[in-house]
From Swiss-Prot:
Protein's name in the database: tRNA-dihydrouridine(20) synthase [NAD(P)+]-like
Localisation: Cytoplasm; Endoplasmic reticulum
Main location: cytoplasm
Cofactor(s) this protein cannot do without: FMN
The keyword S-adenosyl-L-methionine is assigned to this record: no
PROSITE patterns: UPF0034
MF (Gene Ontology): double-stranded RNA binding; flavin adenine dinucleotide binding; FMN binding; NADPH binding; protein kinase inhibitor activity; tRNA binding; tRNA dihydrouridine synthase activity; tRNA-dihydrouridine20 synthase activity
EC class (word): oxidoreductase
Region (Disordered): 438-472
Family recorded in the similarity comment: Belongs to the Dus family. Dus2 subfamily.
Classification via Pfam families: dsrm (PF00035), Dus (PF01207)
């Protein structure tokens, strides 16, 4: 996907803000449906992106940037190619340019996060830490402007002093960036503090480039008409909406907010169509439900442990099944057209024990997996640890793993979405062929449970091993323990 150089205009636009864990592809597409002109992805760290490989996903019709562990870090599609802005977290000009060149043919703009106050960002010299180093800001932005053919922007917070703020933004403007987004709070302020509209106004009146006002959710923006009021209060060219859009993306719709259940169902459809990980889907839906998490539907969402269960909670079970059938058919069609891309494990298959099975996470307790059970059995039998060898098909990026135990190989004939799932499936084949328990609900290994309970007492002075989250904690935690700093994280940093 290639779009015209420097074609993105930041004048008089409604913009979806970058939000950690929220600004993934389903939310961006939904915001575009409801009237957003520009959508930002969540902040992605430069070092993480530089480990990624660009992959064209023909099954989903997307472009994926995939980490070495096979996790999709950034996914985009043709629908948003001329309106999506890639936001990075960086503290180094050369790394920033390398990331920009990696993604520039698949996005419409490049943005640098210079406002996130969270420790994970500032400790690395990124986010709000850059505000105290204008020389580094200038180097990063100048390097990007000169080195990429996409419009470059940055998103900042204001400084405690208006004079210092204006001096900084004037220096930023001289780097040649196309626009600047301003969150009207300083790095120590949180959403409960009032947004400084007058400071954003002073910036807008000082600069000649578009100024994008941010930080007005809740206090100023509760419905669509409020967006224009906030723009006028700040004299900004455009408005960037974060939390209000996270709560209900139809805030961008001129005709007014749509019913929340309708919005959530539309979001879920995009999540399934684009194979969004269910934990991310669940998190975003929880942000929309907010105080309704204790409702019957909220409890169903709370308990959901897969995309299918999320769909069933919202009456979309049939849609899920139909979509999966369509994706499977598309995958099979692609494989049929390119048989040379169907890769089998490199080993001689004559001695491999095979079964047509897949690992289903829902059938196992949160703390127990087939791989754990197989490893424990090997230890008891004084056998070498299991050895997993995994291959990936080029055409659909599916995985198949072969596990070797006591010189015997085991493999499933069904391919999985990830290397981790494929390894779990191979472990199941081995365990079932030996008639061994695999840790399914109701048949947990006593030795595994014993090891789990005794672990904290083995070395009282050593580091504690964090237990995996219980089902639903991903959904529930933000609304039980969400403090002001966490809310600030959602405001787009």
């Amino acid at each position: 996907m290639i779009v015209n150089s420097l074609s993105l205009c930041y004048h008089n636009k409604l913009i979806l803000a970058p939000m950690v864990r929220v600004g993934t592809l389903p939310m961006r597409l939904l915001a575009l449906d409801y009237g957003a002109d520009i959508v930002y992805c969540e902040e992605l760290i430069d070092l993480k992106m530089l480990q990624c490989k660009r992959v064209v996903n023909e099954v989903l019709s997307t472009v994926d940037f995939v980490a070495p562990d096979d996790r999709v870090v950034f996914r985009t599609c043709e629908r948003e190619q001329s309106r999506v802005v890639f936001q990075m977290g960086t503290s180094d000009a050369e790394r920033a340019l390398a990331v920009a060149r990696l993604v520039e043919n698949d996005v419409a703009g490049i943005d640098v996060n210079m406002g996130c106050p969270k420790e994970y960002s500032t400790k690395g010299g990124m986010g709000a830490a850059l505000l105290s180093d204008p020389d580094k800001i200038e180097k990063i932005l100048s390097t990007l402007v000169k080195g990429t053919h996409r419009p470059v922007t940055c998103k900042i917070r204001i400084l405690p002093s208006l004079e210092d703020t204006l001096n900084l933004v004037k220096r930023i403007e001289r780097t040649g960036i196309s626009a600047i987004a301003v969150h009207g709070r300083n790095r120590d302020e949180r959403p409960q503090h009032p947004v400084s509209c007058e400071v954003i106004r002073a910036i807008a009146e000082t600069l000649s480039i578009p100024v994008i006002a941010n930080g007005g959710s809740h206090d100023h923006i509760q419905q669509h008409v409020d967006i224009e009021d906030f723009r006028q209060a700040t004299a900004a060219s455009s408005v960037m909406v974060a939390r209000a859009a996270m709560w209900n993306p139809s805030i961008f719709l001129k005709d007014g907010l749509r019913p929340l259940e309708e919005v959530m169902q539309k979001y879920i459809r995009y999540a399934v169509q684009y194979d969004n990980h269910y934990t991310n889907t669940k998190y975003c839906l929880c942000q929309m439900l907010r105080e309704q998490l204790e409702s019957p539907q909220g409890r169903l969402l709370h308990a959901a442990q897969s995309s299918q269960e999320i769909c069933e909670a919202f009456g979309l079970g049939a849609f899920y099944e139909e979509t999966i059938r369509e994706l499977d058919a598309r995958r099979a069609d692609l494989l049929a057209k390119t048989p040379e891309a169907v890769e089998e494990p490199a080993e001689d298959t004559s001695g491999i024990i095979k079964m047509a099975i897949r690992f289903d996470r829902r059938a196992y307790p949160p703390q127990i997996t087939p791989k754990m059970c197989l490893l424990e059995w090997c230890r008891r039998e004084k056998l070498p640890q299991p050895v997993y060898e995994t291959v990936q098909r080029t055409i659909d990026r599916m995985f198949c793993s072969v596990v070797t135990v006591a010189e015997q190989k085991y493999q499933s004939t069904l391919w999985d979405k990830s290397k981790k799932l494929a390894e779990q499936t191979a472990a199941i084949v081995c365990l079932r062929s030996q008639g061994l328990p695999e840790g399914r609900l109701g048949e947990e290994s006593p030795s595994l449970n014993k090891r789990k309970r005794e672990a904290p007492d083995q070395d009282p002075g050593g580091p504690r091993v964090q237990e995996p989250a219980l089902p639903g904690e991903i959904c529930k935690k933000p609304f039980v323990t969400l403090d002001s700093s966490e809310e600030n994280l959602l405001e787009g940093c």
